[in-house]
Amino acid sequence: MSRCKAVIIKMLTAFTAIVWLAGCSSISPYSTVTKLDLKLTASDQLNPDLNGRPSPIVVRLIELKHPVAFENADFFSLYEHAKESLSPDLVASEELELRPGETVDFKLSVESGSRYVGVLAAYRDLRETQWRYVVQVTPADLTVAELILDQTGVHNKNEKLAKADD
C-alpha cells in the first residue's frame, strides 16, 4: 500500500511541476508571443449624428502582415469585403461597439505573422473623419497603444498630446 501511495505522490508532484512551469512560461518576460495592450477611449462627442448628438460606433481590429492594402483601400471595401480587399495580408479580425464616453482595454495575443493591427471605425461622416489607424506591433514583445476616438476620428493619444504642445 505504501508503494502505491509513493507512486501517486510522485505522479501528483510531477503533474504539479508541469502545470507550474507552464504557468510561469505564459507570464515570462522572455515569452516569444507578440502581445498588444490596446486602450480605446471614446470621447463624449463620439460620432455625432445629423443633430450633433454623440452616437455609438462599430470598431474593427484587423491583424495584418503588411499595412499597405489596409492603408490604400476605401472604407466600404474594408468594411464589407475585408477578406478580399486585404488578402493575403489579413490574419484575423474582431469587431466591437464603442459608446460615447466608454473606455475598453484589450490584452491581445497577436497571431503569428501579424505585424500590424488596423483599427477601422465606422463613422457616420467618413469624409470628415480619420476612420482608420494602424498600430505596428513588435514581434515577440509587448506593444502598448492608447487610441482616442472622437468627433474627428481615431488618434493616438500620445501623438495628439505632442501636437497640442507644438
Predicted features, each with a name:
Residues 73-110:
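Tryptophan-paired
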